[in-house]
């Protein structure tokens, strides 16, 4: 994965960073939406679905070594870095668009 820092991600998705200032320059190693795939250095994107609100998995993901998480709400008493966003789904779209532009490769759509 090309280098994306928490600071870049917060800026790109219009989010507000909460957490230690020294973590802002930490690089995200992967982006996940499935809490079962949490790994060291990942960014968790909790999606609110019809049946499950993935925000409830944030504690387990952080315990598994995630670097940070996005959240559609302010997390009181959080002792880990997170980026508050209006919509996790829109934020991950914004991050993906920014990431693709960094790669400077042609993108082809097949219909």
Q: Whereabouts are the PLM-identified features?
A:
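Walker A (P-loop) phosphate-binding motif
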Residues: 96-111
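N-terminal leader/targeting and accessory segments in enzymes
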Residues: 1-98
């Amino acid at each position: 994965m090309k280098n994306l820092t928490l600071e870049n991600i917060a800026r790109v998705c219009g989010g507000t960073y909460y957490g230690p200032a020294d973590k802002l320059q930490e690089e995200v190693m992967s982006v996940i939406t499935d809490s079962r795939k949490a790994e060291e250095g990942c960014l968790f994107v909790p999606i609110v679905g019809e049946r499950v609100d993935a925000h409830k998995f944030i504690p387990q993901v952080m315990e598994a070594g995630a670097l940070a998480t996005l959240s559609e709400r302010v997390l009181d008493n959080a002792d880990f870095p997170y980026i508050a966003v209006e919509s996790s789904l829109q934020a991950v779209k914004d991050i993906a668009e920014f990431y693709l532009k960094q790669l400077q490769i042609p993108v082809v759509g097949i219909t």
